[in-house]
């Protein structure tokens, strides 16, 4: 899934994982109430007491319509009264809402809820997550949390659990056993097993890899038909991961309830729109991650919202700084995404906001605000965009008492400083959040002075001792996409040059994986992908010799093993100096590995790393 990239093949199938595959395993977030050290703000559950609260003179968007200058009262986890002129009891804790907008807690309709996803999401007003692929662990605890009204500083999670895919297909590349299907006859038992595990809906993968010049086994039309029929017979939603127009048409014809990615290979036409309208499907475009796949990393949006930067954890900042390999070369296809979103919306097809976090260019929680902005840029008005993250997913996924501000609704609330109903960018100005009626502590942005001091300390570490990476052969290993089910392979040998040691890499890069690669990787410790503090180093000096020009550097860092690598092209035949201060999102205090890879399919090649030094 995504811990690094789960729906990546979906819309992007560019799953860039090397030996980190084991670390990118799709698994649910920590059990409710658990604390973890992978996020600065995770586990902070010192919530305000559940007394009667009144937000007065506030603009209310109830999930469907707008009420100006209203009072909203809530206690014991539920909203009790909403309206103008409602009396406020003396015992109530009163919050002045003048100039502000109260929204229902937001729903992100496509994430991978791994690690501390729930804690990170809620800090930006996302109180419900729809997880599109994770291992079925702790699902009972997750269900208990969302059914109750106990204090929590984590978003509730509804999950697909395992996804339905073919043997060797998308979703099987993460190093964990995934129950696959090979025939329609297996569909009924497969669906029954998922529901027994606790899945809330069924996700079906229709993905042959062609959208990204790859080739993957995928489910037959007959098997997809059988899966949809089995899910519907059990009154369960069936949604589909697609990457192309043809895949989407197949899903619609099979009777799926919704598409959880949009495609960019072509624009929708009359035939597609008519089929979608007749079938009554919904669409989760995942515009944020598609923007990353087609040339727009999440930091571009974040630059317009600098106030949020101080509230982001290191993992979130690092993930936002990334985009998918080769995204710039596909930038022209982004216009198809915008057109398709607008055309589907104009045809009356429900659009749901979903980010596909934590893929490259996205981060839990904060990216929902970028998603809303992209939906508006694609043709939705701000009110419709907000509906896509509140009432619409609540109705279509059967989420019950969420996505609304009415008596009896769950008191999941977000107070915005401004009016996102007129300017959607205002949604990012999250001032206060309530989950189950309890006020959630919100990390306040650092002052600009504090940020400058922090950035300065990182930019000017004490000079570290120079490290020759070629001195210790035990730190090096071959790495290729065959580990992920691809067809590429690599091996390494040590050779002597005139007066030094060099690493010769045999790289056989072949089609058959969304992002083919083969090369070598240096681990900072004797254990692969374990972090070490290199904050005293300022640059990497590297030189490689070999045929071709398609070499790429990848720097792995971050508190969590599944963090996205920082990437940069590498020249051949001359010294390359990589200044770490220019590599946005790199955390030298937790540097894990440095990789050098060939990335274009070709006959077997040999290249040599003649110099590799940290300074």
Where are the regions that the model predicts?
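Active-site neighborhoods of metal-dependent hydrolases
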Residues: 189-212, 263-378, 450
């Amino acid at each position: 899934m995504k811990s690094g990239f789960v729906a990546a093949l979906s819309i992007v199938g560019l799953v860039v994982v090397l030996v980190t595959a084991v670390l990118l395993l799709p698994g649910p977030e920590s059990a409710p109430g658990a604390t973890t050290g992978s996020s600065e703000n995770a586990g902070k559950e010192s919530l305000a007491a559940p007394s009667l609260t009144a937000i007065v003179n506030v603009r209310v968007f109830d999930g469907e319509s707008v009420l100006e200058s209203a009072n909203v009262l809530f206690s014991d986890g539920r909203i009790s009264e909403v309206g103008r002129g409602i009396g406020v009891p003396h015992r109530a804790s009163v919050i002045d809402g003048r100039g502000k907008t109260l929204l229902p807690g937001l729903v992100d309709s496509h994430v991978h809820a791994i690690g501390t996803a729930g804690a990170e999401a809620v800090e930006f007003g996302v109180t419900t997550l729809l997880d599109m692929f994770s291992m079925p662990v702790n699902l009972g605890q997750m269900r208990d949390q969302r059914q109750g009204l106990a204090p929590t500083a984590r978003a509730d999670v509804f999950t697909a659990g395992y996804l339905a895919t073919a043997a060797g297909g998308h979703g099987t590349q993460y190093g964990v056993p995934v129950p696959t299907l090979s025939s329609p006859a297996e569909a009924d038992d497969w669906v029954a097993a998922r529901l027994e595990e606790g899945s809330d809906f069924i996700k079906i993968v229709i993905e042959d890899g062609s959208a990204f010049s790859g080739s993957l086994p995928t489910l037959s039309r007959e098997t997809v038909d059988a899966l949809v029929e089995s899910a519907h017979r059990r009154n369960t939603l069936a949604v589909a991961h697609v990457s192309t127009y043809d895949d989407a048409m197949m899903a619609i014809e099979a009777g799926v309830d919704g598409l959880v990615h949009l495609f960019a290979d072509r624009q929708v036409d009359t035939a597609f729109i008519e089929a979608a309208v007749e079938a009554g499907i919904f669409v989760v475009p995942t515009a944020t991650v598609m923007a990353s796949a087609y040339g727009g990393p999440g930091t571009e949006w974040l630059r317009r919202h600098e106030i949020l930067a101080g509230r982001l954890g290191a993992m979130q900042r690092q993930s936002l700084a990334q985009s998918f390999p080769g995204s710039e070369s596909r930038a022209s296809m982004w216009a198809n995404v915008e057109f398709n979103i607008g055309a589907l919306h104009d045809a009356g097809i429900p659009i749901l906001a979903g980010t596909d976090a934590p893929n490259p260019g996205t981060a839990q929680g904060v990216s929902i605000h970028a998603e809303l902005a992209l939906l508006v840029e694609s043709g939705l008005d701000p009110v419709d965009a907000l509906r896509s993250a509140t009432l619409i997913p609540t109705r279509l996924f059967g989420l019950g008492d969420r996505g609304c501000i009415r008596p009896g609704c769950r008191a999941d609330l977000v107070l915005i400083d401004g009016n996102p109903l007129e300017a959607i960018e205002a949604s990012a100005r999250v001032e206060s959040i309530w989950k189950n009626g309890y006020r959630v502590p919100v990390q306040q942005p650092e002052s600009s002075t504090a940020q400058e001091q922090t950035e300065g300390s990182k930019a000017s570490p004490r000079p570290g001792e120079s490290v020759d990476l070629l001195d210790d052969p035990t730190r090096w290993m071959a790495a290729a996409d065959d580990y992920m089910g691809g067809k590429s392979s690599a091996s390494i040998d040590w050779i002597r040059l005139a007066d030094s040691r060099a690493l010769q890499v045999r790289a056989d890069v072949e089609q058959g994986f969304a992002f083919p690669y083969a090369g070598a990787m240096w681990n900072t410790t004797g254990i692969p992908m374990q972090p070490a503090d290199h904050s005293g180093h300022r640059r990497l000096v590297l030189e490689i010799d070999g045929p071709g020009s398609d070499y790429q550097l990848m720097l792995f860092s971050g508190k969590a093993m599944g963090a996205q690598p920082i990437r940069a092209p590498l020249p051949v035949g001359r010294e390359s100096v990589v200044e770490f201060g220019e590599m946005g999102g790199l955390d030298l205090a937790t540097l894990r590995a440095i990789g050098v890879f060939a990335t274009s399919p070709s006959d077997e090649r040999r290249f040599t790393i003649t110099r590799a030094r940290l300074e």
